[in-house]
Amino acid sequence: NILFPLQNLKGEDKLSKEEMLERAQKVASLVQIDELMERKPSELSGGQQQRVAIARALVKMPRVLLLDEPLSNLDARLRLQTREEIRRIQRETNITTVFVTHDQEEAMSISDEIVIMKLGVVQQIGKPQDVYDNPANLFVAKFLGTPPINVFNGVIKNGGVYIAEDRILDADIEDMDVYV
């Protein structure tokens, strides 16, 4: 199953059977499924099948690897374990990896850099901790964090920031409605 992407290579990219087997074995070892090489996909657990899928993607030695919701079908325990494995594999191979997820915990824990999008529009790009500490807008602020950030409607008036009737800060800027 891991060999399949290599069997379709053409021209100068084409590999000998020995080269294909060597690459497949190396990648299987990297994703820790080398002892499962003789099994059929139907004989593998969900986590093992996910590792085979990652191995198939890695065996071609891409410059960029796209993983689109790779953990979405795994149970919570396996998600955590596989997430750590993906991070380890990415670091060992040094392949630029685009990891698409709707799970903020996955994004924050696995990424060197994150892109927060809303309806296909980029809201913010940055290192996870920087984005968390300095959200670019209210959407990003509400999207990140467990538990979610507390947001209050406030107003700036007469040189102060108010929540309800309580003055909480001095603010020497024009009067306006704000989120605090």
Functional labels for PLM-detected ranges:
Residues G160-V180:
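Glycine/charge-rich catalytic "coupling/switch" loops of P-loop NTPases
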Residues Q90, N153, L169-D170:
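Short secondary-structure boundary/capping segments
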Residues P41, P135, P147, E165-R167:
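Short, well-ordered turn and helix-capping elements at secondary-structure junctions
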Residues A53-I54, F152, V161:
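Residue-level recognition of conserved structural "scaffold" positions that shape functional pockets
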Residues N134-K157:
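C-terminal boundary and immediately downstream tail of ABC-type ATPase nucleotide-binding domains
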Residues G126, G159-G160:
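Intrinsic-disorder/low-complexity loop/linker signature
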Residues N1-F139:
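ABC ATPase nucleotide-binding domains
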